[in-house]
Amino acid sequence: MSSWFFPKARPRVVFFLISIVSEQLQTLNGRVTSEVRFRMIGILPLMFFLAQAVHYWRIREFGHVLWMCNIGNLLLAIGLFWCNRRLMRIAIIWTIPGLFVWFLYVVLAWGVFFTSTLAHVGGLIVGMFVLRQIGMARGTWLFAFGWYLIVQLLSRVFTAAELNVNLAHRIQPGWEQRFGSYWEFWLVLTVVIAITLWVVEILLRNIWPVRLAQAEVTLT
């Protein structure tokens, strides 16, 4: 979950690209359907994901892209491009716990870095905007939990053990004395994650229920 600190010129480049996307969305307003405009929002989380992916590729730790907070931006982008509400909601529900974990284990330990901030804060902002349009559906937490289990399994199979992506290989450092084995830690972690996703879904459903969603697009 570490991130690459861009030199001064590079944040400007990213902000410039984001401004271009925003200008294009405004230019297209009235010339394309609202559904197409809604799909194009997916360019933003895709950019957030690619910024992190380029960083990890450069430092030869590409496995870090499978952290839930990073891969979630890619899932949100795909959901928007395909106009798939379920994929959008799965990605969005993960932005809340992802933000807290990032703040506790990255910001407090290492400080604020540009691409990491884009992935977490930027992803959250886009996610909340999208959620206003589609609303949070009951039962989303179950799909989000299943998504977590799949990504954690992929992390265990395809990423290096020293990266410990999604805590798929060993106990989180500092917690070794509390658990007798990794699988005891994994079981507790899995239960905590399931409960957290359930609580986050309830919170988001109360704020943006589906029946009050402001979408003007027809989604599948």
Where are these regions (language model features)?
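Membrane-interface helix caps and helix-loop-helix hairpins in membrane proteins
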Residues: 54-62, 105-114, 134
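Hydrophobic transmembrane alpha-helices
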Residues: 46-73
